[in-house]
Amino acid sequence: MSAGKPEMFPSDRLPEIAFLGRSNVGKSSLLNSLAGKKGLAFTSNTPGRTQTINFYRVDGAFYFVDLPGYGYARVPLRHKLEWKKLIEQYLENAETLKLSCLILDARRGWMDTDLDLKRWLEERGRPYVVIATKFDKLNQSEQERGMRAIREEGVEPLPFSAITGRGAREIWQAITTTLRPR
């Protein structure tokens, strides 16, 4: 289900796991890998392809929520501002949001917009994990350097590769732990 306005968000109150990150960090590839469905979320080499909030129902039990990427995208500023507003409305009002997965490209590390989002989540007490994608594109020393740089912000990132599937089990563990009744 795609939602371009808050009134289009699901109303069935199922728990939600949101995937947030800059344009082209691999959010859709991560979703496809976790869901085990290659074409679930549309992937593209062109930044800014995800332009609505997409809700994917998983086993009838919860939603994966694919949010538009922030940052670089070849679209008019008006569209970027609309996406920003939509994302903010979702994050501010999502009562069933159980976990935010903040996605970083392991080759690039933190950008100011990522740090702003991290602070925003922390200030509101929203649980989150940081996932470092595109791990397969780095050699061993680059992987270590990238992880160290991400850790400097006080978080332990979960490395992930959509090509090899590395890290999928750990991400699923974080998700299922969050969804477990307390």
Which residue stretches match the model-derived regions?
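Conserved G1/Walker A P-loop phosphate-binding module
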Residues: 1-74, 180-181
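Canonical P-loop GTPase G-domain recognition
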Residues: 1-7, 137-182
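Switch II of P-loop NTPase G domains
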Residues: 8-12, 46-54, 68-98, 106-120
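Conserved protein kinase catalytic core
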Residues: 39, 72-75, 111, 139-140, ...
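Conserved C-terminal guanine-recognition region of P-loop GTPase G domains, centered on the G4
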Residues: 85-156
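Short, glycine/charged-enriched secondary-structure capping and boundary segments
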Residues: 13-15, 34, 77-80, 115-119, ...
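Hydrophobic aliphatic residues
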Residues: 34-38, 91, 154, 175
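Structured catalytic cores of enzymes that bind and process phosphorylated ligands/cofactors
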Residues: 17-31, 53-54, 60-61, 99, ...
